[in-house]
């Protein structure tokens, strides 16, 4: 699978399948990287106008007809407070729209992992289950549906929300969504039978263990960023640009806020390269999850929708 296809191939794949999941290119809005370097030494990394410019630079340069953005709020969000997340979402929607690209920004909850997994291969497993219609009521599917509804409306492919939801449900239940994903993988150089035989292609960690809590209780809160950084430490992300990524590691079967855990119900399953790495990740996960006796519910998933003002 080639995540960095030549522009011609990228265009051909989009024309033939309707989608291409690829990495960014340094040739599009190249000044962004240099400007970030200046921000880093001028204490302006947290400047919302400059963050907005950085986020939108490549997107506007690519010539989009419309844009839908997902801006997170909560312990796993890029911005440190709900107020800052809200300010960023509004800024992105307005600036992009005023630059000629009608934009909608959804403010969605990230106070816990969006999916019951975090990593690379484990997230692909979840993705395939979603495409097969096996996670109809999951949090990640709810967010995906809201984003897709906005995209269909922005692209003038449907007249309203009800028509968009009908179209989405049909794509999932008919198998069309899974079929298009499989075709995209094949067109970008991946295996033709990936959907049918994904287990044969996805990396599997040598050490897979359940992570049990030190005491029983109900999940009250997550430090979602800490969960993500634990995956990075396992090798599932990069701390340096030249570092390699271990696609096999991460967490699966992660509990949600409001779930009860004990000696029989683990917090998650850790996938690691070594026993030592698994033990460190397990300790980090326990520290990232707050347990208590009270019933708990997650924050509202879709919190606000910002439509750009011209």
Per-range role (PLM):
Residues 1-62:
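Phosphate/pyrophosphate-binding betaalpha-module
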Residues 17, 44-54, 58-310:
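Well-ordered secondary-structure scaffolds
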